[in-house]
């Protein structure tokens, strides 16, 4: 009761209501970034598949080492990529950085598919290749995804940077979700 009484004694100046813009799609999605968003979504699908199902894939083809190290090597690759990719993006080579990352990821997926055949000839070499693939994949994804974020922010005017980041994260999350659903 005392709180209500105290609050009723507070006087504030009148402020006229602020006219708000109607809610529209362009407040949540950067329309100018939709082509890049589609590209990012498509690139996130194999990432979602890999991070969720690579351990089962390794066990199925006969790799018997601790497949959890795959993610350790992938994280090391992502850390390595940050050493040089940020400098290249700062120099304006965003699309070249994305293309390089894409090529590394494509190569790593072809190598990952070849493990099915390589393990029949040499188990140790296949295991080493498996972890090398994780390192290469980490470098590729570690190069691509931060460059995509910079691309989205650069496409947006200053007052829509939050919208640009929202578009980036939505594309990323939807791609990973599709990858998890379709990969299993």
Task: List each model region and its residues.
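Residue-level signature of mid-helix packing/kink "hotspots" within the transmembrane helices
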Residues: 75-83, 176-177
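Loop-to-transmembrane helix entry/capping segments in MFS-fold secondary transporters
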Residues: 64-65, 158-168
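Transmembrane alpha-helical segments of major facilitator superfamily
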Residues: 69-78, 172
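C-terminal membrane-cytosol helix-exit motif in multi-pass small-molecule transporters
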Residues: 1-17
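C-terminal transmembrane helical hairpin of 12-TM major facilitator-type secondary transporters
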Residues: 93-148
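Small-residue (Gly/Pro/Ala) motifs that create kinks and tight helix-helix packing interfaces
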Residues: 55, 178-184
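Extracytoplasmic gate region of multi-pass secondary transporters
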Residues: 33-71
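Helix-to-loop junctions at the C-terminal end of transmembrane segments
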Residues: 81-94
């Amino acid at each position: 009761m005392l709180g209500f009484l105290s609050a009723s004694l507070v006087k504030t100046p009148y402020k006229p209501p602020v006219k708000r813009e109607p809610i529209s799609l362009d407040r949540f999605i950067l329309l100018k970034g939709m082509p890049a968003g589609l590209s990012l979504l498509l690139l996130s699908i194999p990432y979602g598949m890999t991070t969720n199902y690579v351990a089962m894939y390794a066990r199925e083809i006969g790799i018997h080492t601790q497949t959890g190290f795959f993610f350790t090597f992938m994280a090391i690759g992502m850390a390595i990529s940050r050493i040089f990719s940020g400098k290249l993006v700062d120099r304006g080579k965003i699309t070249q950085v994305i293309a390089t990352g894409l090529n590394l990821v494509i190569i790593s997926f072809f190598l990952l598919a070849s493990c099915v055949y390589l393990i029949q000839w040499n188990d140790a070499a296949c295991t080493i290749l498996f972890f090398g693939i994780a390192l290469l994949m980490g470098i590729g994804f570690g190069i691509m995804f931060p460059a995509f974020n910079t691309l989205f922010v650069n496409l947006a005017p200053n007052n829509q940077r939050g919208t640009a980041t929202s578009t980036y994260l939505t594309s990323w999350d939807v791609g990973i979700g599709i990858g998890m659903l379709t990969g299993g």
